[in-house]
Amino acid sequence: MSRILAVSASEFAIARRNRWVFMATGIMTLFALALTFAGAAPTGSLGVDLLTVSVASMTTLSVYLTPLLALLMAFDAIAGEAERGGLALLMTYPVSRGELLLGKFAAQLGVLAFAVMVGFGAAGATAALAGGAGAESLAALARLIGTSILLGGAFLALGYAVSAVGGSSTGAAGLAAGLWLVFVVLYDLGLLGAVVFDDGGTFTRTVFPWLLTVNPADAFRLWNVAAAEGVALATGMTGAASALPAWAAPAALILWPLLALGLARIAFGRIEP
């Protein structure tokens, strides 16, 4: 454990020196506040408070932005170290590859968690002060922050995996961009095409909701929508969420970081420094 903490402290210092802490926090805060002010108009027609609408908007924001920030932080973690010669030096220390990976993961997840808490917390506080907030909307905000951190953890670990197999920083960057595109954009487009083709058949009613849990981005969205009636009303995503048991989306989102870390460890084990 002490070796993992030592690696984590070193990685966090590097992230702070490279301005990742400030950039990630600034980007998250800027977009969250912009969506909060932009979403103030429809609250009256929906019959929910401003914080609920803001949480619904920030849920959509997090689906796109959190994986992107996570992959930007992670794609260079192994490939970049190998190119700069730092990986060979690290391998001479009394630390295993698993401990090295966990140390990097803890540090970068801490950076991402800080950005999420500050960004969404500031936007949530602004919405609550401007338009009021109930107990359900406050719980939805807390859940959004927690699930965004889980989502970020999944994509950080996936970023380490592509960093290990990319061969170079350039190759890893291309794989990371493709990974983001597949999970965040193309997967849903493919499912949408299948639903349209099925025209309300068996696939739409039984298979489609479960396929959403296969994707961590969709599992994140389903968890936040299914757990709060107000957020479901603001997003309109009630059909797929109601077709699944309550544990399905949470279980998928919790398992994804563990699965992705396992894949990253296997890929990292094949790297020769």
What are these regions (language model features)?
Residues M1-T25, R270:
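Aromatic- and glycine-rich beta-strand/loop motifs that create alpha-glucan
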Residues L5-I14, G47-L51, S96-E99, T238-A241:
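Cytosolic juxtamembrane amphipathic/interface segments immediately preceding
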Residues A34-F37, G44-S62, A107-T170:
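Secretory targeting signals
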Residues A41-P42, V48, L181, V185-P250, ...:
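Terminal transmembrane helical anchor/hairpin motif
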Residues S57-G80:
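Long, hydrophobic alpha-helical segments
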Residues P67-A74, A122, A157-L158, Y187, ...:
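Hydrophobic/aromatic residues in alpha-helical transmembrane segments
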Residues I149-D199:
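A structural motif at transmembrane helix-loop-helix junctions in multipass membrane proteins
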